[in-house]
């Protein structure tokens, strides 16, 4: 049995895959989870974790020296942790706090694996690539990796929660009621909460629909619900839940942000989606994530910068009037997730970590 340190922090996009990797490894190895305060809120209370906080400094030139100082302190702290614990392997799923941990792991000559689910490599991972043994990716053609490091890429099917492999939304049924999911990922989407309600109400005058919508924190669900009920729209409104799609997967179409985990889950469940990438995502990675699926003819894209009132209404009406395109996208999603199982993925991950 080896001791594996999983380093993760920041958003759910980093932490949730780390938890899924934790589940894959915990039966064979002694697994320790390191995260920061922000990331800890996504981790169940019953999962043991170590808080490793790193002060994040704004990306401003005049803060550069202060940033270096804080990272140096964090690196020293990481060295102390490695000197007090016998870690064999480090797996980093990202987050600002992972930078000093991976550098300390290199100093102590540990095996290092990075995880990059996006279609363009993140800045920290790009910097750390020279120190790592391998990098797990969902896309072998990931953008931004130097050709000298291409041999470090290990392409894996998405690392999802185990419950996802039980549920599938395989068949198209020409129901009279269209079930729509609006989801914004772990950080929710203020844009969706502010802009989609009137679109949905207008849409309900043309098609019989049932709505399930994630709201941003701070919104009053009851007040929001009243407007839908006035228009006879059956609805289920909720705030972020980590395993929501494990319990609710029977949807005809989704409107979603384009975080890698959100798109991977919708793909695995065979739910065609309209992607509205978050325009402020670092290096515009959400747009690249969406384009990957669009190139595979699995989704539609609406960019927020070009968004006008009525766009969602028009797009869904267009989709409902062109069932052949919808069915094509659903079938393409099905092909992407065929023959994928928790057990096979588990064997692959463990075999790579156990290689000498």
Language-model features: locations:
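Acidic donor-binding loop of glycosyltransferase active sites
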Residues: 87-89, 249-264, 271-272
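Conserved donor-nucleotide binding/catalytic region of nucleotide-linked donor-dependent transferases
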Residues: 300, 306-337, 355
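Conserved nucleotide-sugar phosphate-binding/catalytic loop shared by glycosyltransferases and other
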Residues: 4-9, 31-70, 156, 184, ...
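C-terminal alpha-helical cap of glycosyltransferases
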Residues: 338-356
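An amphipathic, basic-hydrophobic alpha-helix
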Residues: 60-89, 103, 107
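Active-site-proximal region of nucleotide-activated glycan assembly enzymes
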Residues: 30, 38, 108-168, 295
């Amino acid at each position: 049995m080896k001791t594996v340190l999983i380093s993760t922090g920041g958003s759910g996009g980093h932490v949730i895959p780390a938890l899924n990797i934790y589940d894959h490894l915990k039966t064979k190895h002694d697994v320790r989870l390191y995260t920061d305060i922000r990331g800890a809120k996504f981790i169940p209370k019953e999962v043991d974790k170590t808080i490793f906080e790193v002060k994040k400094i704004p990306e401003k030139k005049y803060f550069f020296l202060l940033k270096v100082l804080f990272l140096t302190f964090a690196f020293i702290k990481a060295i102390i942790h490695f000197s007090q614990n016998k870690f064999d392997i480090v797996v980093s799923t990202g987050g600002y706090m992972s930078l000093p941990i991976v550098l300390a792991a290199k100093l102590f000559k540990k095996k290092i694996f990075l995880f990059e689910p996006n279609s363009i490599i993140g800045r920290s991972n790009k910097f750390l690539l020279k120190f790592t043994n391998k990098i797990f990716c969902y896309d072998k053609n990931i953008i931004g990796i130097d050709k000298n490091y291409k041999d470090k890429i290990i392409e894996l099917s998405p690392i999802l929660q185990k419950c996802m492999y039980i549920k599938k939304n395989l068949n198209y049924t020409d129901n009279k009621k269209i079930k729509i999911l609006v989801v914004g990922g772990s950080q929710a989407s203020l844009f969706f909460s502010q802009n989609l309600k009137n679109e949905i109400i207008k849409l309900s005058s043309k098609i019989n629909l049932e709505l399930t919508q994630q709201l941003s924190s701070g919104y009053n669900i009851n007040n929001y619900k009243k407007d839908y009920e006035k228009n006879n729209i059956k609805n289920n409104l909720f705030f972020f839940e980590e395993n929501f799609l494990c319990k609710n997967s029977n949807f005809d179409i989704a409107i979603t942000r384009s975080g890698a985990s959100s798109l991977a889950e919708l793909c695995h469940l065979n739910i065609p989606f309209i992607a509205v990438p978050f325009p402020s995502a670092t290096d515009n990675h959400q747009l690249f994530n969406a384009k990957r699926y669009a190139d595979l003819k699995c989704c539609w894209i609406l960019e927020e910068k070009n968004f006008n009132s009525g766009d969602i209404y028009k797009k869904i009406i267009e989709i409902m009037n062109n069932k052949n395109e919808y069915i094509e996208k659903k079938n393409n999603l099905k092909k992407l997730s065929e023959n994928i199982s928790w057990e096979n993925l588990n064997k692959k991950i463990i075999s790579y970590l156990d290689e000498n």
